[in-house]
Amino acid sequence: ILGAGMGQIPFINLLKERGCYVIAVSVKGNYPGFEIADKCYYVDTRDKEAILEIAREEGIDIITTDQTDVSVPAVAYVAEKMGLKGIGCVTAEKFTDKYVMRCYAENAGIPVPKFIQVNCVDNIIDKVSRMDYPLISKPVNSSGSRGVHRIDNPNELVEKVKMSLDSSVDNKVIIEEFIEGKEY
């Protein structure tokens, strides 16, 4: 299982109750999953090649994650490379990259807010000129609301987009029109 934090504990416990040998992979830290897993590796859960190497060495039958989007691409990659059941890399990208997800939804005829992807703040005011405020900026590949900022007017635009860029792993941010409503 990729991840060893509080979000993964119920799933690790369930796997162990069902007699599974559980290997937890996550960056080094004080994560409770390391204490209950049968074996641990301290590796970034986005490092696909390192995780593939571990998976091959261990001869795993299943790879999964729970409660974290950032690990999904690595799970899909390893499953594809090892011929295990999984969602596949293309589906994982559609699920975890907010820009790719929006493009896919738009192309499928699903209504989406106006959006753009940026990797810097150069000419940012021109780039959003056809969008209505408020806006939202967020890293395309983050989860847990990290780097998400509401932008109420053009005066906040550069600062908030920079903050989102600072939270982005690959320096990509999506800016989209804000939609009022409940978050699910």
Go through each PLM region and give its residues.
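Conserved SAM-binding loop
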Residues: 64, 94, 150
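Active-site nucleotide/adenylate-binding loops and adjacent lid/helix of ATP-dependent enzymes
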Residues: 97-180
